[in-house]
């Protein structure tokens, strides 16, 4: 069973993620802030982390940095959940090891298929390809502006 860690300070977002991912037979672990998210990532070893960027205290960027620094968590794929859709924010997420980003508000029904697709590609050894595709996507968007 796929295990997803949702780190978000907003309880309604965590609930939305939980309900939709559990409906697709995924196990969901929740953390309401950065420090508890880091602890749960180390203990639970999730298959993927859905990480909010804008949280009080330890924000999502710093959580991602710490996940990358820890040998136990550096290989866990991160999908950033963010209301910040600017190019530099997306690029920062990719530079911090993120493999995708979902802009809030989002359609919760799209979460489980996204997680499945990303994990399938990672299992096939395409993690670097995922990041490269997102970088290319950002470049295209920047060039069209």
Please annotate each region the language model reported.
Residues 55:
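Receiver (REC) domain active-site loop signature in two-component systems and cognate sites
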Residues 44-50:
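Active-site beta3 strand of CheY-like receiver
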Residues 122-145:
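CheY-like receiver
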Residues 15-23:
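Charged docking surfaces used in two-component/phosphorelay signaling
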Residues 99:
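Short, glycine/charged-rich "phosphate-handling" switch motifs in NTP-dependent
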Residues 106-115:
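C-terminal output helix
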């Amino acid at each position: 069973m796929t295990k997803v860690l949702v780190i978000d300070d907003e309880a309604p977002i965590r609930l939305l993620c939980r309900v939709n991912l559990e409906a697709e037979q995924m196990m969901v672990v929740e953390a309401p802030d950065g420090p508890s998210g880091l602890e749960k990532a180390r203990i639970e070893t999730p298959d993927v982390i859905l990480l909010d960027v804008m949280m009080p205290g330890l924000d999502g960027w710093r959580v991602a940095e710490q996940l990358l620094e820890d040998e136990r968590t550096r290989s866990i794929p991160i999908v950033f959940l963010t209301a910040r859709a600017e190019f530099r924010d997306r690029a920062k997420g990719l530079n911090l090891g993120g493999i995708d980003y979902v802009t809030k508000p989002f359609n919760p029904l799209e979460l489980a298929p996204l997680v499945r697709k990303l994990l399938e590609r990672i299992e096939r050894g395409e993690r670097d390809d995922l990041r490269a595709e997102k970088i290319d996507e950002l470049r295209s968007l920047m060039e069209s502006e």
